[in-house]
Amino acid sequence: MASQGGPRRSLSVTTASLHGKKKSMDMAERGLDTGRRSLTVSRSPLGLTGGERTVKRLRLSKALTVPATTTIYEACKRMASRRVDALLLTDSNEMLCGILTDKDIATRVISQELNVEETPVSKVMTKNPMFVLSETLAVEALQKMVQGKFRHLPVVENGEVIALLDIAKCLYDAIARMERAAEKGKAIAAAVEGVEKSWGTNTSVPNTFIETLRDRMFRPSLSTIIPDDTKVLKVSPTDTVLTVAKKMVEFQSSCAVVIIEDKLRGIFTSKDILMRVVAENLPPSETLVETVMTQNPESTIVDTPIVEALHIMHEGKFLHLPVTDKEGDVVAVVDVIHVTHAAVATAGTTAGIGNEATNTMMQKFWDSAMALSPNEDDEDSRSESSMKVASEAETGKSFPFANTFSFKIEDKKHRKHRFISDTRSLTEVITAIIQRVGDDIDPDNFPQILYEDEDHDKVLLASDSDLQAAIEHAKSIGWKSLRLHLDDSREGKGRRRRRASGSAESMEYVETDAWAAAYSGVAAGAALVAGLGFMAFLRKFGH
């Protein structure tokens, strides 16, 4: 792995130092490249302060560990039963000696036509997988994972592998912060333009600067990260698993899209080979892809914002997302690491204004995204053991932070928009709405904001307490997102409002005009805060 962000100290750890509890070892996954051969681990830089987050404070998971003498078939069965796509291997002394992933199964086993019931995993595993120490800075470990393009990394403490770091979980935390920052930035730009129009003046900020904020940071689409020469592995539903596995090696891809009559009808990944073929003991040379593929997979278009693509994969719990053009032809398949790298690079390009040249774009992103806010310090009150290894049976929270929630809204062109916002402030939600459907909003007739409850009633959101009550109710019935509606009809005096105090089910009728005035006040507050923030931004960067 290439070093980033300045010099690092490293410590080579032999497998002999990894003695201890076999059951405490955690899974690691080799990425798409083959660079994870060294057992070198990076230590945290000197001068670590209490405010900097270390690896052991990130989301960690359990893993599966088996002897290297285990047959490939048995290993795959174990992985399938635990619903994991990688496992660690130990030698006769119970020392960590390798790792096996679903990609290894596809490219090193099936494509090579090995006998899975006779071949031990030691023949196809990646030896000496990379890992990090528990005191390593979180930003350093995450940065290395993105650059190296692998999702899982074992975490070592006192010579034992104690946990697994999954970059996908950490990524969504960081992206949620980046998205909120982007939303605030767009509100800043909009506020400045509004002042110019109202006062008939022109600030010292060139329009090109505002356009840069919009185009490079706030609205980058997948089309900006997909090369023109991208090759997509397209197969027929009647192709055999063996044929597709060989093509995966040829295309250096971990997935294939299944096309019927020029339309996307399925997706087949290396994880499917592991879970649905090998673990089920199906013959690859006789099994047709159409019997083991994921049918009618979710896809998106090239104009989809990068952050939106990440949300789609996160909510759908999959790692590959087909991308189509306007005609519906698949032009690319992006994975979570690919999109992450692009999102970080895009954010870093803009955020790098005025910063030291020695910092890399990814380092800036992780440093900013993982920085602790005052109320996050409460996380330290949790037990250290629960921070180290999270139970696989634990579902966990649906959202990256206790004070955030997911929202959906549809514009007048029937396009759906999804965003995550702070649940403590209606101003934050309004800012996000303006960002996405601002063209639908008449500034002289600001709409009411409503949400749809489980009875399909439209309930008013007119204050911070209304918002908090709505979120509490949504969580209590197991919802992961709240569907919002805008009503600019100035009719419907019978709209209902859920009170934050008292019974969660209590409702009261309110006058529409009164709440319209409240919305106007909130909107004015959002513009004022945004304008002040923009001026501070200009002073900081010398514009």
Curated annotation (Swiss-Prot):
Residue spans of biased composition, Basic and acidic residues class: 23-35
Domain CBS: 59-118, 125-183, 225-285, 293-350
Organism lineage string: Eukaryota, Viridiplantae, Streptophyta, Embryophyta, Tracheophyta
SUPFAM superfamilies: CAD & PB1 domains, CBS-domain pair
Transmembrane segments: 518-538
Compartments, record wording: Membrane
Pfam families in the cross-refs: CBS (PF00571), PB1 (PF00564)
Keyword Phosphoprotein tagged: yes
GO annotation, cellular component aspect: membrane
Superkingdom of this protein's organism: Eukaryota
Name of the molecule in the record: CBS domain-containing protein CBSCBSPB1
Keywords: CBS domain, Membrane, Phosphoprotein, Repeat, Transmembrane, Transmembrane helix
Residue stretches making up the PB1 domain: 402-489
